[in-house]
Design a protein with these regions (language model features):
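Membrane-interface interhelical linkers
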Residues: 1-31, 35-73, 83-93, 141-160, ...
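A helix-boundary/kink motif common to multi-pass secondary transporters
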Residues: 28-29, 94-95, 117, 121, ...
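Hydrophobic alpha-helical transmembrane segments in multi-pass integral membrane proteins
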Residues: 44-55, 108-121, 164-179, 227-241, ...
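Hydrophobic core positions of alpha-helical segments in small-molecule transporters
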Residues: 8, 35-36, 101-104, 124-127, ...
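Juxtamembrane helix-start motifs in multi-pass secondary transporters
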Residues: 32-33, 98, 185-186, 248
Length: 292
């Protein structure tokens, strides 16, 4: 089941990337992020109350101070900053290129785990990490030449910011989950993120035109929340406890290849790119080496 969960994460991430990519092009990024957290809170709460049998008061008293601290940090780095920059990168560079950040996130997370979680790394694992990071950075630099010609820097710094924020989020989540039920850990991250996002959203809300009025937008956001915010997050935690972290990360490194096939041959949103495929394969090889 752990392997199925890992591939489920890949599938649900693809659905989430396209769903939130569509939403990010319809309204402000802040609106999409706060809707994601709001829908996530509403969807998970009944599951906590009626499936996990956790009382409403227990939702806030069951977590320890350490749970709140680390999951709160994960909320800030992930659901607030990470999601914001990821949506910006999707809007500026497209869904296919956004998926290529995944191996770099994995590589940086391994580096952070060495310093923050005291994980051991052999020389060949460091070589794999550097191979993955250098490949993605080189790809971003190549893309930067295109962006610089158009005086567009958002696609560059948003990609780098996404890698950094999501990597720290993973470390904070690992340290913050503890003995909490997976759904409760996800809900707490969403709750803290919603509290952090609400003041700037209210401040920026000048008129009702800020929120799209078509039902398709909200339906797609809802699908994205089910797929990525809840489904992928839950299966990620589940698979982390049922298969080795190395196997899971190797499976996750195939995300850009799946995205390439879907983006080019199914949705036909972008043209075939041998350079992208080479970068994706080399980055995946680097992650595989780092996880041996």
């Amino acid at each position: 089941m752990g392997y199925l969960a890992a591939y489920g994460v890949v599938i649900l991430l693809i659905i989430g990337i396209y769903s939130f990519g569509y939403a990010a092009k319809q309204t402000s990024l802040l609106t999409v992020v706060i809707l994601e957290t709001f829908f996530g809170l509403l969807l998970i709460l009944p599951l906590l109350l009626f499936v996990n049998k956790i009382g409403f008061a227990q939702i806030f008293t069951l977590p320890t101070q350490q749970n709140w601290l680390w999951l709160g940090a994960a909320a800030l780095m992930g659901f607030v900053l990470g999601n914001y920059f990821s949506l910006m990168h999707i809007r500026e560079s497209g869904e296919k290129l956004n998926s290529l950040l995944s191996p770099a996130i994995t590589a940086l997370t391994i580096v952070l785990s060495y310093f923050l979680l005291n994980d051991k790394l052999a020389a060949y694992q460091w070589a794999g990490i550097l191979l993955a990071l250098i490949t993605i950075v080189f790809f971003l630099l190549k893309q930067s030449n295109i962006h610089l010609q158009n005086q567009n820097f958002k696609g560059i710094y948003s990609g780098v910011a996404t890698i950094i924020c999501i990597s720290f989020t993973i470390i904070c989540t690992i340290k913050g989950v503890g003995d909490l039920p997976f759904l409760l850990a996800i809900w707490l991250r969403l709750f803290v993120a919603f509290i952090l996002l609400l003041p700037p959203f209210i401040f920026s809300y000048k008129n009702k035109n800020l929120l799209p009025k078509n039902y398709l937008f909200y339906t797609i956001v809802f699908i994205g929340v089910l797929a990525q915010t809840i489904g992928a997050a839950y299966l990620w935690l589940y698979s982390s406890f049922h298969i080795s972290v190395s196997v899971f990360q190797i499976i996750l490194a195939t995300l850009p290849l799946f995205m390439y096939a879907i983006d080019v041959y199914i949705f036909k949103k972008s043209k075939p790119s041998l350079y992208f495929l080479i970068c994706a394969f080399v980055a995946a090889a680097g992650i595989t080496l780092a996880m041996l």
